[in-house]
Amino acid sequence: MKKILTLLVILNMFVSISMAAESDYRKIYLDMKVPDFSYIHGIDPGQYYDNKDASYSVYPLLRLSSPLYFKTITIKPGYYDLTPREHKGKQYILFKQNGLIVHILPVYKKEIVPIDFYRTHLPKPRYTITQKIGNSLHMFVGKVFKSAKRKPLAKTYLEVEDVADNFVILIIYYNNYRYYIIVRSVRM
């Protein structure tokens, strides 16, 4: 009987914690401010540095089929590169199209990515025989000549959670950190 009561008390604590988390979304959303800055000509100054070793954009790509809203900002349907940036000590996510910044949204939480997250969530690339031979040749050249060694690209992942009261949480994984953004699927 004591075990059952203890189990019920613990279960009740977890349920109350999850209910409190659901009700906090409105408070988090209302406490966040619309960014009051912009970049000159909509160009991200760190974009060249991030993409210099890659042949494609290293940022996670978000495809929207319906608009999202953050207070006065309307994010229209389309494709967006999501880029985390820091401005005056605060974290922001830049929504970019064609390399230009379209929207800037604040991050409400930044966490470190768990150690094995990318290994368990990202699929392993499958190579043909000729690609395997080419990769082993590149690895050999990289071992002999250190300057020719390929640098690993940024690891990225994107999660979208639809939570209570028309709130949507975007979780952007970029390298060692994950960034949380809260938006709405309907205007408030």
Q: What residue spans do the PLM features occupy?
A:
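Sec-dependent N-terminal signal peptides
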Residues: 4-14
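Sec/Tat signal peptide C-region and signal peptidase I cleavage site
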Residues: 16-21
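Extended, well-structured beta-strand/loop surface patches
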Residues: 22-75, 83-188
